[in-house]
Amino acid sequence: MNNAFSPFRRLLTVLLLCIFTLVSTPSQAERIYTLKFATLAPAGTTWVNMLQEWANEVERESRGRLLFKIYPGGVQGDEPDVLKKIRFGQLQGGAFTGYGIGQIYSPARVLELPFLFNSIEEIDYVREQFMPDIEQGYRDNGYELIGWMEVGFVYFFSKEPIQTLDDLKNRRIWNWQGDAMGKAFFDASGLSPVPLSIIDVYTSLSTGLIDTVYAPPLGAIAMQWFTKTRYITDIPMANGIGSLVVSRRFYQNLPQDLQKLLKRTGKITGEKLITATRRDNAEGLMVLQQRGMQIVAGHEDLKSGEVENISSRAAASLMNNGYIPKTVIDRVNGWLADYRAGKEQEPLDVPK
């Protein structure tokens, strides 16, 4: 009798195994994806707090299918280190400043050319025109642009007051090691900076290896550089850019609904970061003054003719080495000319 029922039992066993396999193996829709995401911004800053809010929103809306693991404070290394880890699959994304963006799609850094913009409105207008090119440039190089942000207008922070280029020539100025934009600016200004990883800046200010750095107010506060400097020169050199990025490979492996979720929430987060960064930089300047830092008025000659010369020389250098093609710079200058012809300008809110 047992032999008579053995084929049935074997069939039942196979069916049960199949059902168990189907139930225990999640479908693509149920699979959990983890986005390991790095940033130089220290924990507790506006930037990291808003990144965590983004991560929480994505986890909630995806019902736990897309999770973030955020690494703040440069624990995964400087931006070139993070990009290398993304290429090797150790990380899947990060928040980058212009330096890192330049290693993804260098033409985007046309938005950081020194002394290019006269107003916030100009920045927003030109960025909007150029954004489709930036997005495609990221894709062509293996990345997906998820959100755009800013770090804000960059100023010199120094241990001694700086009003002129001659003052700068007597200072030990930091330059972000390997940064083509910084090199172009300093070469155009006739300056010889000290190249260092951003991770080494605080220690180098403490030891006296450098005595001058450049940063937006919020960055100088977040990195604690302001504790080692006493003066801020009131000439904003450039508006520092930033972006939220994931590897193209990771993005394409996500189901379409998670791709759309990541893009939608990432764009909103970038917009929120721009608004918060502009606000916090303005408030940060007031806080720094309250803590005893002095705002130094730049010499008028530096603000006018010399500024234009530096900007032109830096742009020419970046065109000649192929970092930013001439066609890109020409297009941006064209957009600026169109905007300025049709809009009344508001001056930058330079601290006094």
Per-range role (PLM):
Residues 10-13, 140:
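Short beta-strand-initiation
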Residues 22-30:
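Bacterial Sec-dependent signal peptides at the C-terminal "C-region" and cleavage site
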Residues 1-8:
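N-terminal secretory signal peptides that target proteins for export/translocation
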Residues 24, 134, 270-272:
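A short hydrophobic/aromatic micro-motif that marks alpha-helical segments and, especially, helix-coil
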Residues 124-137:
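Signature of the catalytic double-stranded beta-helix
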Residues 29-122, 138-352:
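N-terminal secretory/targeting leader peptides
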Residues 12-23:
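Bacterial N-terminal signal peptides
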